[in-house]
Amino acid sequence: MAVPFRRTSKTKKRLRRTHFKLQVPGMVECPNCGEMKLSHRVCKACGSYKGKDVKSN
């Protein structure tokens, strides 16, 4: 099996790990009911999306 030719330096290791971070979801206020919801998703509180009632309660 192949083995690494050189040891990975601290800088290279840290540069690689800069992308291993948590991402904050894009939260927006629902224009229909005012609850916070994920953008481009149906509102869980009222079931509306783009001004239309998608989820019948």
UniProtKB/Swiss-Prot annotation:
Signal peptide annotation: none
InterPro entries: Ribosomal_bL32, Ribosomal_bL32_bact, Ribosomal_zn-bd
Domain of life: Bacteria
GO annotation, cellular component aspect: large ribosomal subunit
Keyword field: Ribonucleoprotein, Ribosomal protein
GO molecular function ontology, one term from the record: structural constituent of ribosome
GO biological process, one term: translation
Family: Belongs to the bacterial ribosomal protein bL32 family.
PANTHER family cross-referenced by the UniProt entry: 50S RIBOSOMAL PROTEIN L32 (PTHR35534), LARGE RIBOSOMAL SUBUNIT PROTEIN BL32 (PTHR35534:SF2)
NCBIfam families: rpmF_bact
Protein name: Large ribosomal subunit protein bL32
High-level lineage: Bacteria, Bacillati, Bacillota, Bacilli, Bacillales
